[in-house]
Amino acid sequence: MYLNIPTEIWLCILKMDIDSTINLLFTNKYFFDLFEFAKHNFNVLHEVIKRGYVHILKYVDELENLGPLVFIETMNVHDKLKLACNHDQLPIVKYLVETNSNIETINDDVIITASFYGRTNIVEYFIKKDIDNKTIFEALKNACDNGHLETMILLINNGVDIKAKDNFIIKQAISKGHLNIVKYLVENGATIDIEDDTYIINSAQKGYYKMVEYLVYRGADYRTVDDLPIRCALMGGHLDVVKYLQSLGADIEADNESTIDYVFKHGPNESKEYLERYFYWNSLING
């Protein structure tokens, strides 16, 4: 019945939204020839992998073994695995690993990709395949960079040293503002060099209010370098940080008003408005 429908009708059908088109074309193997008309709208293999259609991927592989498929753009196994990691498709990952004999050569890169996206179940699958410590540490860095605590805990529980490379991981977590990760790392033995004022300066500059608060609690000098943390926060428009540090005694005029001048000339509007109110109330109080 379907084969008797004129091509013009099929072309109209294929102009539906992409989800409807894909769901239609994947319902019957006889529809595969129609991908020739739809291939400019989407990548067939991409959609198969993104949606976790293992049975269709198997069928495509069977067809490819018989000869090249002109209606499907080719992808190497490495790219297929990375795409599956991106979309958290563990069944696709397992199928690709089980059907490719040379998969060991790319396991390392794939676990790093899975960690980047926080795909904990995929990371766990690859850890069981004897991944070396250097790769696991790189995976930990990727998970930390993107705030994936659950993935980090899995990697740490599998032997990665959280204090390696001079406590690099906790430094990275602070620089990204991931307070939950910082607290977890501290609770599990990582240390913060609280004498290093770059932590509180950078956190204030980026507007990480909770991180600034935590670093102060841990003993960081919030008045370091002529009150640079509060001045950085002011220049960045992070008024919650400014107000917090002011409540502790920090001074936005500590550098002889050069920061004030900069903000009025180049700073964000909210900081300018804050300074106007600040000086207005100061004039009332001080006469």
Swiss-Prot record:
InterPro entries: Ankyrin_rpt, Ankyrin_rpt-contain_sf
Record Pfam families: Ank_2
UniProtKB keywords: ANK repeat, Repeat
Listed SMART domains: ANK (SM00248)
ANK repeats: 40-71, 76-105, 107-134, 135-164, 165-194, 196-224, 225-254
Stated name of the protein: Putative ankyrin repeat protein R791
Phylogenetic classification of the source organism: Viruses, Varidnaviria, Bamfordvirae, Nucleocytoviricota, Megaviricetes
